[in-house]
């Protein structure tokens, strides 16, 4: 049996609140807003030495070497999204939930499990 490679890692999971409802209202506008939010979020994750290893529609999962870095990235991107939402009409303000977890993970190629 192949030996499993493990390491201690901090995982940040972000998800857009009520994304399906926004898609029901206007798919194209929602996708434009999502892309704009990702243009804010992705560089901030990179700035704090995070690595996005999974995305699915309206979610982003990133790995960080440090819990402090992941929290700082989450705070900065939430503040940036809040600032962005000041100029967006109320019915299309995308809000993001963020969870952070520190644990032993299993590494398989570029993906992480656990």
Each language-model region and where it sits:
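Catalytic NTP-binding/metal-coordinating core of nucleotidyl cyclase/transferase enzymes
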Residues: 1-73, 79-80
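Catalytic beta-strand-to-alpha-helix segment of the class III nucleotidyl cyclase homology domain
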Residues: 39-42, 61-114
């Amino acid at each position: 049996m192949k030996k499993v490679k493990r390491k201690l890692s901090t995982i940040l999971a972000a998800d857009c609140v009520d994304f399906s409802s926004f898609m029901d209202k206007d798919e194209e506008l929602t996708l434009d807003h999502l892309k704009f939010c990702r243009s804010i979020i992705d560089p901030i994750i990179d700035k704090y030495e995070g690595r996005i290893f999974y995305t699915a529609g309206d979610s982003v999962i990133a790995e960080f070497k440090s819990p402090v870095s992941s929290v700082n990235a989450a705070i900065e991107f939430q503040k940036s999204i809040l600032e962005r939402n000041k100029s967006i009409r109320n019915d299309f303000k995308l809000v993001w939930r963020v969870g952070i977890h520190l644990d032993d993970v299993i590494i398989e190629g570029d993906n992480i499990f656990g």
